[in-house]
Amino acid sequence: SGLLDRGASADTYTLVKPDVLIVATGARERGLVFPGNTLPGVYGAGAFQTLVNRDLVRAADRLFIVGGGNVGLIAGYHALQAGIDVVGLAEVLPRCGGYKVHADKLARLGVQIYTSHTVLSANGADHVESITISQVDADFAAIPGTERSFACDTVLIAVGLNPVDEFTRKARTYAMKVFDAGDAQAIAEASAAMFTGRIAGRQAAQALGSTAAIPEEWHQMVAVLSSHPGKPLARHVPTREIGVFPVFHCTQEIPCNPCTAVCPLQLIEIPGDDIRHLPIFTGIPGGKDCTGCGRCLTICPGLAITLVDYRKNQAWPTVSVAYELATEHLQIGDAVTILDTEGGMLGETTVTGIRNPQSNDHTVVVQLAAPAALAKQVAGIRMPATKSAAPLPEAVEHLSDDAIICRCERVTAGEIRARIREGYRDLNELKAVTRAGMGACGGKTCTALILRLFREEGIPATEVTEGTHRPLFVETPLGVLAGRMETADD
């Protein structure tokens, strides 16, 4: 602290010679190459979420998402909260890689999720007007005849992240003492970054002579918080039909436990010592039992808990669900569609109550009357007017080999494919003959895309020579070192 002076002018610089470095530079988004990927209206998830969440800009009217990881799923939900119509989501794998509770939230709001699908093209003259997707086979190749197009004005690309680790790797080649944390070390949830940051801090302290130990539990917690979600399990449906109690709609083991901490009577537990296990309710009718406070509903980030209350009417119990969209058009007495966990329609009912807990930010509790046979299946609601987006009558023809791989130098996929087919296997040679990777970003965006082209051409990674990265130190204009200020006359 104190090294950077906010009042310093642009023509000054400070040399810092640290004994130890901690790099926590985060991650950058992976790009995806397809015809039309440079059209205005094609966003990375980070830029889109910055506009919507931080700047409060309604960045689209009709949005299509490519990528079913947590980033894409959560961005889609944020778009719906902002009043943006989410037309659909395409995921190339047979199952979304993000948490199932997040995918279920989108499905319950009418978003169609197309698994085993890829994007073929974004279409439009000077901006995005539609997107064309296609089903893929086991080798992720598009299946002819399965193309379909959807009208949209925005395409959101959320196909993963790459660590910003160039500085770390280069610093280690110079034998500098460097430790990394967060996504700069490995892509994981923000909760994992908190622990990798603690570990990096202790490692740096030890490198400076501290004897403070690093608790083994920290490493164990990083492993848990960084783990991939498990396969969905069969949902446990409670058999009791008396009193009031929570029903859990989460069926996938993920590192999540806020419901256990918020219950004032400590009636929600996670078996064992692993927070990835599914929660259970331990209340006993006639004994220590749920009071229906609803705290577990509104704390759950996956909206995967409902309350079923038989106390007033056992034939038509009251079901309480958490709701996070705009409520100005939702009134007591309104008809709504009730849905199961994955968005299947169970029928229609009416809203009997709306609670707005003061302790929760923009989360309300909507109460419904549901028949006893369906009450424990209800996981959410949808306004009856909500409809899933239908594909256009005909798929839009997508373009061929002119997709831009290197945006800095405007190098197309066709140019690079041609060189690969000629026998080029060295990224440095490709850079020399095509200028791909020679731009201002230093190949940070296009390198992964070029490697993907090698894979598509069937070239093993062992045959590809990586490019030579720029030196550790950043290029600096000579005038800065001379302390010279340029004027309009220069």
Language model: regions and residue ranges:
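Iron-sulfur cluster-binding cysteine motifs and their immediate structural context
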Residues: 258-277, 295-312, 335-337, 341, ...
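Short alpha-helix capping/helix-loop boundary micro-motifs
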Residues: 319-326
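Short beta-strand-centered aromatic/proline hotspots
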Residues: 344-358
